[in-house]
């Protein structure tokens, strides 16, 4: 099992935190794991333990910078990903994204020469036809979003998370504890700015050239994802020339929590 080492440093004058583990296959480009909302690189620990790679806390999340003067929009994150990889002297990657880690798809469109393989899991779709889920609509609404953020606690997150996965009950205590341990005003601000800068038309416009992604791509989706319907797995597979879609029965938004074998499927694809 690869040893996971924590790192901290500045990326373009912004403090950043990331985890890194030696690859199970050192002859290929490292895997870059990009997490979603409202979590951190902690999501990827079981993947790092199996396949190695690099998992940053994106700005606004976890232990990375949460400055108030940042835009936290798609352009900002795409530039940050490039700056981060340059900072750690990594040129090409094999990329895995989940939820808002799907910003990596937007980055891949701008940097196709840097991506050798791609896994998309239950990610925000840069495709036509997506309508934001109920919680996102609240966050996108001024004042109401701030009010909802102020009410968020471990208890409310446990209640909300009951719809997130197919297994009865809330998300695992460890995931909720991790999310809430970093859910300060800086993270709340980043989430609100990210959602408010990303109406459906911006998502579709961002991904209008998604067919230009030509690397081997695996699209995995929990069949019971309540936030992003599984039909977007098929939509991504139709739009990306070298992509295959697999719907995961009895799995929700974090499919590997309902079906741990997803971890092996993802790691095998990325390391082969």
Segments the model singles out, each with a brief description of its role:
Residues 117-147:
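Flexible "cap/lid" loop of the alpha/beta hydrolase fold
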Residues 32-36, 98, 221:
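The conserved beta1-alpha1 loop
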Residues 129, 150-211:
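Conserved alpha/beta-hydrolase catalytic His-Asp/Glu region
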Residues 224-228:
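Acidic catalytic loop of the alpha/beta-hydrolase fold
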Residues 213, 219-221:
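Short beta-strand/loop motif that positions the catalytic acidic residue
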